[in-house]
UniProtKB/Swiss-Prot annotation:
Its main location: mitochondrion. Residues 1-59 form a transit peptide. It comes from Homo sapiens. May play a role in RNA metabolism in both nuclei and mitochondria. In the nucleus binds to HNRPA1-associated poly(A) mRNAs and is part of nmRNP complexes at late stages of mRNA maturation which are possibly associated with nuclear mRNA export. Positively modulates nuclear export of mRNAs containing the EIF4E sensitivity element (4ESE) by binding simultaneously to both EIF4E and the 4ESE and acting as a platform for assembly for the RNA export complex. Also binds to exportin XPO1/CRM1 to engage the nuclear pore and traffic the bound mRNAs to the cytoplasm. GO terms for molecular function: beta-tubulin binding; microtubule binding; mRNA 3'-UTR binding; RNA binding; single-stranded DNA binding; ubiquitin protein ligase binding. The modification Phosphoserine is found at residues 1026-1027, 1029, 1138. The gene is LRPPRC. GO terms for cellular component: condensed nuclear chromosome; cytoskeleton; membrane; microtubule; mitochondrial matrix; mitochondrial nucleoid; mitochondrion; nuclear inner membrane. Residues 712-1067 are annotated as: Interaction with BECN1 and Aedes aegypti venom allergen-1. Disulfide bonds: none annotated. This is Leucine-rich PPR motif-containing protein, mitochondrial. Residues 1121-1394 are annotated as: RNA-binding.
Length: 1394
């Protein structure tokens, strides 16, 4: 063995290098390439151990089979989405807990199988999940699961390659599964799958796990003949092999052999040696080795120490566990690792050791109720731990305050697992502690017996309830007991006979609900007549509705309804029998489908007529609801029959007289000649000239008719002059604007344009004065405003204007015109970095944090400091960051700075700091920088150093590395990544596999895996490439890098240089550059590039995304005419614009009052609305808004009314949403329009029973803070309160928004009956929790509990999280699962009930 290893010394050194020589990498079976056999279509091979599958079924596959099984585009897309979803679910579980629950893996497996088509990634994902990620399963169960997955996916068409075999090997190793490595190799060769380095490494490990050194030597010999490098993983396996063969001396000597071969033993090798000592119970050698490691530069993580603990425990030496636990540093990643070890120990029946580790976990016990031990207790229940042990564990967990209610939780687990005997024993223990036992505790036990109709089992559980002093409630009887018997009477008799009927009245009411739901209306009528107890119609309504639908006896329908209407026992609500029965009829019809109503039309007609003869009446507003339902069900003939029940049949109301308005004259000259007002027409003409960029003519027109100019015309002219860089003209126009109306306000974009041009021309004080005016006049600040300020400041910074940057920034922030964000504070540091003044740059960055809590450009400052060796300043920066933002942030800042500057040794020390964990956003940020700057070595080091970083997404890291290799055309390095992915057992996403395959193909290399098919055609292939008159790769590469770095000016300068030298890039480069430049500051340059590309590349066009961005930019710059033209061009090219782009155009036209162009856009998009995802209401709302803007309010209202009341409706009334129109009218303070809209909405409600508009208007009033107006509207139109679905949807949407608790509360105060709705008080609690309003949340909870309202788990979970956040005790047992779990549970419950 030693000779084999030493002879491979030169190869080991080669393997340790970042890149092997090309000659070595092309050797057959080398680390980078596979044998020619592996290039054949991969066989659908089965597991190779133990003859799991027959050879015929394992290896039969033909190349043409792939053609037969080709999938459609839609199917491929579905499979891709399916894999992404599965990966996301499993990845999330691993990141959060370090493990995968069996149920989740089973669900992903089942869903994947149901999808019908499978790629290699699906199989790889599922196989790799069957090892150590399943600590809750026994080892043999894990392997069995893996084999089942292999068999099933093979039948479904999965194609296996070497990565799948390697994954199966990994599972075998993790599960200690015994198999024949030689048979495994033979099966692979039969399947035309060539083993690679990873395969051989894992086969060696399999021999070593059973102490077979001879077998390992054979595999090592194979590796030598194939010139494969022997890595540390092989040496670590050999340590284990010698130890398990009883040869500890040679196990220790492996470390010496490693050093002789040029490899220094790493943490993995020492861990193998430590585990070997632990398996022998040799605590002394373990301690000595740990001390040796501590003195070296190596670092063993807590998870490594936990593995040593497991080795001691499993080998029968639990007495040494405490000594190893003392050495645990409790890194942040420790908890999930410890939890997984605890689960594994319980699985191995080592519960006492598991408890010892659990009690040693560093869990805070001062943050309110704790449930940390829940996972341990639940798994103990699953593994059938004796009840005596369980109660003892619960007692210990409670004593140390690690779990606030361990017994109750364990009981909960036993009930869910249907472990009856354990549950009963635990209930007794819970009761002995003084806690009440509720009826619903027994439901999980009853449900199984109900399914089996096990009467004796039901009786035993009911007796058990009596023993514990628990009486069944109505739900228990209705849902679980009565369904087991032939009838309610037989159930009563048998229960009485067995002494299980403790509350006869409770059972009677439950029996009524049960028989009603089953359609036994004879029983219901008889019961209601003879009953002496008051029963609320509300309590039996849902059961009665089911019964009515299941019985066709109209006489019974009528008699029961009459009894409910006339008997005071059943209609005790304040609203009286008329309204109660009215709502019952409405709910009856609403609960039916349209086909059911049509089938029962005659029965319903008879029902209505019989009720009319019985003098049963319903309110008018409820009749209207019924009428709308009947219309939507296409049975209008029933409306007249339902109308018979209305209390007052006078449904005619006086129509409100509509007002009229004058029409505008056609031309300015005609108006002037007739000596009539011309202001409106003059303004419109100014606006048109501005849109055409005709500045000279617009200014001439202004001078000619100056006395008739209005503020809107001046505003447009100011903006035009700013665009043309005419600073003096803009200032003069602004002065005239102020003289005309000192209170007038420009819109935000025009103010920003004016500030920008003033700052650019050095008029700093004028610019600051404009900023002050923006504040004084309370100008609306948009999202784009802060970005515009940044560009203005950054331009000054690059020019080195320190005082300009400082004063403008201070003015903007002090006046509150922009948040002092990191982005807007960048120029403050940039101006000093440009001058090389690092000390001042750091001081300014620190000053920004002290003032604004942002730290701009700290990475760039640190890199400069590291490069200059400014240790004092580095220490100062790090001390500050650590103190203010925490040690984790400081470590990442320093890590990235060291990486960026090539100080990899220091970077390694940082990333190995105990407790550090992956911050995905920060890692991705640095990866993007490396890719954009083409920093290959830096990114490679990042990927290498983060290999063992907790929660690091290794696939994403390798994907970033491959992106860089793709740019550089480096297939050799990309090929090495494929081996590393397998070595690390990483599950590659489809995008990673596609990218790797693309790189290999571009290098004329074979692809050694099945490539997932694309469901779409990549945009870049649709761009027409052009052969340049002169090719200059450096220019093109530079411009692409500048684009990735978001360096607009730099990219544009490269374009100009290339243009001067007559260099033409390909179409894709120009598209990227145009998209980059398409911002407010560089729009002109973007159009210049576009024009150049169009004249130099035949057929050049922007793609859908770029054109959509162009449209949005044109709208933002108020180039509406150009935006409409661009939209037309996009559609002519058969492209699909984004919904956002189209919506922005329409909304901007509406704000200008441009009805004509909105209609033009509508015609252009005719038939394309669905593909864009554009609602017809976008046009309806904005055309109406445009008409209102033109003071043509009556026309807007008339159009809306016609659409809602005509027979041929464009949109059904219930979907006719006018909320946008109402909101804009209210925001713009268009009072005449608000008044007329209110009249229209009320008229539609009162005359036509169309309540959607008035309800939308009511809600918009509330949302705008006009609560008194909303209250008055509600008093005039009470039907608003009955539009429950609309109201609840509004509450739900607002509960998701920050700062909307007052809005939600206002709606509930105005409509108190909504408070009874579960969705309503859930929304209110959600709002309180988001705003951390503990006092209001407490009041809500106390109010609901006082009314005995049944609160769902999601409500309680939210409330509990708020109390814990505030450091207050939780007055109930907090639901143990996640928010997502309870939200999904509630969603399913509602879907089932509907």
């Amino acid at each position: 063995m030693a000779a084999l290893l030493r002879s491979a010394r030169w190869l080991l050194r080669a393997g340790a290098a970042p890149r092997l020589p090309l000659s070595l990498r092309l050797l057959p079976g080398g680390p980078g390439r596979l044998h020619a056999a592996s290039y054949l279509p991969a066989a659908r091979a089965g597991p190779v151990a133990g003859g799991l599958l027959s050879p015929a079924r394992l290896y039969a596959i033909a190349a043409k089979e792939k053609d037969i099984q080709e999938e459609s585009t839609f199917s491929s897309r579905k499979i891709s989405n399916q894999f992404d979803w599965a990966l996301m679910r499993l990845d999330l579980s691993v990141r959060r807990t370090g493990r995968i629950p069996k149920k989740l893996l089973q669900k992903v497996f089942n869903d994947t199988c149901r999808s019908g088509g499978l790629g290699g990634s699906h199989a790889l994902l599922l196989l790799r999940s069957c090892g150590s990620l399943l600590p809750e399963l026994k080892l043999e169960e894990r392997t069995e699961f893996a084999h089942r997955i292999w068999d099933t996916l093979q039948k479904l068409g999965a194609v296996y390659d070497v990565s799948h075999y390697n994954a199966l090997l990994k599972v075998y190793l993790q599960n200690e599964y015994k198999f024949s490595p030689t048979d495994f190799l033979a099966k692979m060769e039969e399947a035309n799958i060539q083993p690679n380095r990873v395969t051989y490494q894992r086969l060696i490990a399999s021999y070593c796990n059973v102490g077979d050194i001879e077998g390992a030597s054979k595999i090592l010999g194979f590796m030598k003949t194939k010139d494969l490098p022997v890595t540390e993983a092989v040496f670590s396996a050999l340590v284990t092999g010698h130890a398990r063969a009883g040869d500890m001396e040679n196990a220790e000597n492996i470390l010496t052999v490693m050093r002789d071969a040029g490899i220094e033993p790493g943490p993995d090798t020492y861990l193998a040696l430590l585990n070997a000592y632990a398996e022998k119970g040799d605590i002394d050698h373990v301690k000595q080795t740990l001390e040796k490691v501590e003195k070296s530069e190596l670092h063993l993580m807590d998870r490594d120490l936990l593995q040593i603990i497991f080795s001691f425990s499993k080998a029968g030496y639990p007495q040494y566990v405490s000594e190893i636990l003392e050495k645990v540093t409790c890194e942040r990643r420790y908890i999930p690792d410890a939890m997984n070890l605890i689960l594994l120990l319980v699985t191995e029946k080592l519960e006492d050791v598991a408890l010892q580790i659990l009690l040693a976990c560093p869990v805070s016990k001062e943050d309110g109720p704790s449930v940390f031990g829940s996972f341990f207790l639940q798994h103990c229940v699953t593994m059938n731990t004796p009840v005596e042990k369980l109660t003892d564990y619960c007692k210990k967990l409670k004593e140390v305050q690690m779990h606030s209610f361990p017994l109750q939780f364990t009981l909960h687990c036993a009930l869910l697992a249907n472990k009856t005997d354990l549950a009963k024993a635990l209930m007794k223990a819970v009761k002995e502690e003084g806690f009440p036992i509720r009826p619903h505790y027994f439901w999980p036990l009853l449900v199984g017996r109900r399914k089996e109709k096990n009467v004796q089992g039901i009786i035993e559980i009911l007796k058990g309830m009596q023993e514990l002093g628990v009486h069944p409630d109505q739900e228990t009887y209705t849902d679980y007991v009565i369904p087991c018997f032939d009838s309610v009477n037989s159930a009563r008799a048998i229960l009485q006979e067995n002494g299980c009927l403790s509350d006869s009245d409770m059972f009677s009411q439950a029996g009524l609900r049960s028989e009603a739901a089953n359609g036994n209306l004879d029983f219901v009528l008889s019961f209601l007549k003879s009953n002496t107890l008051p029963i609320s119609l509300q309590s039996i309504r849902s059961s009665l509705l089911l019964g009515f639908r299941r019985s066709m006896n109209i006489n019974l329908w009528s008699e029961i309804t009459e009894l409910l209407y006339k008997d005071g026992r059943y209609c005790q609500e304040p609203r009286g029998p008329t309204e109660a029965v009215g709502y019952f009829l409405y709910n009856l019809i609403d609960s039916m489908s349209d086909s059911e109503v049509q089938a029962k039309e005659e029965h319903l007609r008879q029902y209505f007529h019989q009720l009319e003869k019985m003098n049963v009446k319903i309110p008018e507003n409820i009749y209207r609801g019924i009428r709308n339902l009947l219309e939507s069900y296409h049975v209008p003939e029933l409306i007249k029959d339902a109308h018979l029940l209305v209390e007052s049949k006078n449904l005619d109301f006086q129509k409100t007289v509509q007002l009229t308005s004058s029409e505008l004259e056609s031309t300015l000259e005609t108006l002037k000649a007739e000596n009539q007002p011309i202001r409106d027409v003059l303004k419109q003409l100014i606006l048109v000239l501005c849109s055409e960029e005709n500045m000279q003519k617009a200014l001439e027109l202004k001078a000619k008719y100056e006395s008739d100019m209005v503020t809107g015309g001046y505003a447009a002219l100011i903006n035009l002059c700013c665009r043309h860089d005419k600073v003096e003209d803009a200032l003069n126009l602004k002065e005239e604007f102020d003289r005309l109306d000192s209170s007038a306000v420009l819109d935000t974009g025009k103010y920003v344009g004016l500030v920008r041009v003033l700052a650019k021309h050095g008029k700093l004080q004028d610019a600051i004065n404009i900023l002050k005016e923006m504040k004084e006049k309370d100008v609306l600040i948009k999202d784009t405003t802060a970005l515009s300020f940044f560009h203005m400041l950054n331009g000054a910074a690059l020019r080195g204007e320190i005082e300009t940057v400082k004063q403008l920034h201070e003015a903007i922030v002090t006046l509150g015109l922009a948040e002092p964000s990191t982005n807007i504070s960048f120029p403050l540091v940039t101006v000093h970095l440009e001058k090389g003044d690092l000390s001042t740059a750091l001081e300014v960055a620190i000053d920004c944090y002290e003032k604004y809590k942002v730290l701009p450009r700290i990475h760039d400052v640190l890199c400069k400091l590291v490069e200059k060796g400014e240790t004092d300043l580095i220490q100062k920066a790090m001390d500050f960051v650590s103190q203010e933002q925490g040690e984790m942030v400081m470590l990442y800042d320093l890590f990235f700075a060291f990486l960026q500057t090539g100080n990899y040794k220091e970077a390694k020390k940082i990333i190995e700091t105990p407790g550090i964990r992956a911050r995905s956003a920060r890692l991705q940020w640095f990866c993007d920088r490396c890719v954009a700057n083409n920093q290959v070595e830096t990114l490679e080091k990042l990927v290498e150093l983060t290999q063992k970083l907790f929660e690091c997404d290794r696939d994403q890291m390798y994907y970033n590395l491959l992106k860089l290799y793709k740019i550089n055309g480096d297939w050799q390095r990309a090929d090495a990544v494929w081996n590393k992915i397998q070595e690390e057992n990483v599950i590659p996403r489809e995008k990673t596999l596609r990218l790797l395959a693309e790189i290999l193909r571009e290098g004329n290399q074979e692809v050694p895996f099945d490539v997932p098919e694309l469901w779409y055609e990549d945009e870049k292939h649709s761009l027409n490439s052009s052969s340049a008159s002169t090719t200059e790769p450096d220019f093109q590469k530079d411009i692409l890098i500048a684009c990735r770095l978001n360096q607009k000016k730099g990219a544009y300068d490269i374009f100009l240089n290339a243009k001067e030298q007559n260099i033409v890039f390909n179409a894709e480069t120009y598209s990227n550059l145009i998209k980059l430049l398409m911002s407010e500051d560089y729009f002109t340059q973007a159009m210049e590039v576009k024009a150049f590309a169009e004249t130099h590349i035949k057929g050049f066009t922007l793609n859908d995304a770029a054109n959509s961005r162009l449209i949005i930019t044109q709208v933002r710059r108020d180039y509406l005419k150009e935006a409409v033209t661009t939209l037309k061009t996009v559609l002519d090219q058969q492209q699909t614009p984004s919904r956002l782009a189209v919506t922005r155009v329409i909304q901007a036209l509406a704000m200008k009052g441009d009805v004509e162009n909105i209609e033009v856009v509508q015609k252009m998009l005719n038939g394309l609305e669905d593909s864009i995802g554009l609602s017809k209401m976008v046009f309806i709302n904005n055309i109406a808004l445009a008409q209102i803007k033109n003071n043509n309010i009556d026309a807007a209202i008339e159009n809306i009314e016609n659409m809602l009341t005509s027979e041929n409706k464009v949109i059904e009334p219930q979907y006719f949403g006018l909320a946008y129109l109402f909101r804009k009218v209210i925001e713009e303070q268009l009072e005449p329009a608000v008044e007329k809209i209110s009249i229209m909405a009320e008229r539609l409600a009162n005359q036509f029973a169309i309540y959607k508009p008035v309800t939308d208007f009511f809600l918009q009033l509330v949302d705008a803070g006009k609560v008194d107006d909303a209250r008055a509207l509600l008093q005039r139109c009470g039907a608003i309160a009955e539009q429950t679905p609309i109201l609840l949807l509004f509450l739900l949407r607002n509960s998701r928004k920050q700062g909307k608790a007052s809005t939600v509360k206002s709606v509930l105060e105005l409509i108190p009956e909504l408070n009874e709705k579960e969705e309503a008080y859930n929304s209110l609690m959600k709002s309180y929790v988001s705003e951390k309003d503990v006092t209001s949340a407490k009041a809500l909870y106390e109010h609901l509990t006082a009314k005995n309202t049944k609160l769902d788990d999601l409500f309680l979970k939210r409330y509990a999280s708020l109390l814990k956040y505030a450091g207050e005790p939780v007055p109930f047992i907090e639901p143990p699962e996640s928010f997502e779990f309870y939200a999904q549970q509630l969603r399913k419950l509602r879907e089932n009930s509907s």
